[in-house]
């Protein structure tokens, strides 16, 4: 007998037919003698619909009241799934986040899980109940409902798995696993049998919409084995785990991130400490900087170029305009018509020539590189947005289609 945590996203429970499909998946694991805990998201577009309803009444509602509203979506899903499982004749109980022991920080709308007290869940499991828990939510020290932000249900599932020392945490989505590229865009993308935590974290951070990056961080921290699979088929999924050196793939995936903008500060005086001042100001405003390029100019000046998330571009520009006035730079230039394309693979750290192959693929596709960033398991390039799809196709063909991976 194993203890299994299963998480189902909004598309998996969007209507009655899908809810009964999930009920069948859950009860099949229960019939095998397993203890089963299920985490659910709100149905379909419920969260967006609730936000729209709020905006009709108040364009700027308090974050506390928004959390009170948004937690209703998961409560509906949990109750409906419990009713479907009851209909099939199995013992089941649904719990809200606070009933399941989730205590969070006080940051409404983007709370962090501080601890999970699993005693109520354990008590229900001891009665041989299937336990359904609302994802995405908890309660803070003021006994107020809080939400964990987008993708929070993934994090809820992993947190429960860690608290219960579960044998496996299954994340059900509308795709059959983790692919070498977006299969909707790259028809020859291949499903991976397994991928390391570090690789999955990089892909999640780069915009691969399979797992939330916070959930992957938590899974790695507590060594929780994840399986990403589809609720619409019964096909085997992708295992996310710590992998051995022999299991490491050279390249695990290609990802494209359009949520990026490039900002350049022109004519920065070439003096010690100015780069520190620039990036510390950005950090104070919670503006995350990714790729950085510094070019030395003439007459004792330099240009500093960096990328930020597109929705933070205006705030970064406003901040840097102040910097220009205070420290003698000549101007700020921004461009959001760019995209970041990356390859990820834990095997590249011990295989020279990967960057060369990537750049060759881009050259052959006539794609110009504006900026480059590298780490042990990732290489990213910034290019024109209109060339993004072509670049991903060319890189995927170079690494996965020509060598038969």
Question: Which residues make up each language-model segment?
Answer:
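Short phosphate-binding/catalytic loops that engage adenosine nucleotides
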Residues: 34, 90, 224, 287, ...
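Acidic-aromatic/histidine active-site loop/patch
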Residues: 219
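A conserved regulatory-domain signal marking ACT and ACT-like small-molecule sensing domains
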Residues: 239-405
